[in-house]
Structures are given as C-alpha cells and as structure tokens.
C-alpha cells in the first residue's frame, strides 16, 4: 500500500492506494497519528485507489475518528469509497460514523 499526505491550510489529505489489511494498516495508523500529534485534527482520507479494507483498517479509521472528535477538535472524512467497501462499513453499523464525499475538493471544502 502506498500512502501520500498533503497538508492544506484547513486540513490534511491522506491518500492510500492498494489494500488496507493487517500488514499495511500499521503504516496508515502511523500516518494518521503523525498528523494528530502535530496538532491537526481535520483529516480527509482519499480512498479512490483503495481496493480492499480489512477490519484492521476500519479499526485504524475508527480510532482516528475518536481522537479527532475528542473535545470537538475535528474529524476524519472519507472520499471516493468504493461500493463494496462502503457496504462492509454499513454491514457493521458504522456507515453513519463517517461523512463520505465523492471528491477531495468537496471534502476539503467541508472544513
């Protein structure tokens, strides 16, 4: 899995490509934590090139969301989530836990 991070004035955008599973999720967690540890809590996660998301990947996103929302500091929003990945999120009842946008521009503009 490849991860790129771009910092904007209002938020940070993380883009991942490939599979997010038990072997690659720690890298995603490290990228998310680096942003939070720098005092930034508004994160856009671009999933347009993510083709698989395991429960470990969802766990990373849920834990990141908890950290971002603590004390109403911010949140993580998702972009371009593939239908099969979105349905797995809905299946476990977490579909409403994240705001989901069609494109990065809309997601960045939401902050």
What is each stretch, according to the model?
Residues 22-97:
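Amphipathic alpha-helical interaction surfaces in cytosolic regulatory modules
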Residues 99-103:
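Short acidic-hydrophobic, aromatic-tinged amphipathic segments that line or gate anion-handling sites
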């Amino acid at each position: 899995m490849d991860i790129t991070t771009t910092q904007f004035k209002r938020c940070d955008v993380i883009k991942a490509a490939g599979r997010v599973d038990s072997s690659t999720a720690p890298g995603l967690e490290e990228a998310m934590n680096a942003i939070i540890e720098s005092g930034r809590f508004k994160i856009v996660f671009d999933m347009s090139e993510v083709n698989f998301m395991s429960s470990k990947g969802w766990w990373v996103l849920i834990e990141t969301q908890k950290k971002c929302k603590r004390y109403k500091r911010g949140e993580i929003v998702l972009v371009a989530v593939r239908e099969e990945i979105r349905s797995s999120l809905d299946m476990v009842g977490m579909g409403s836990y994240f705001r989901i946008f069609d494109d990065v521009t809309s997601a960045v503009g939401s902050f």
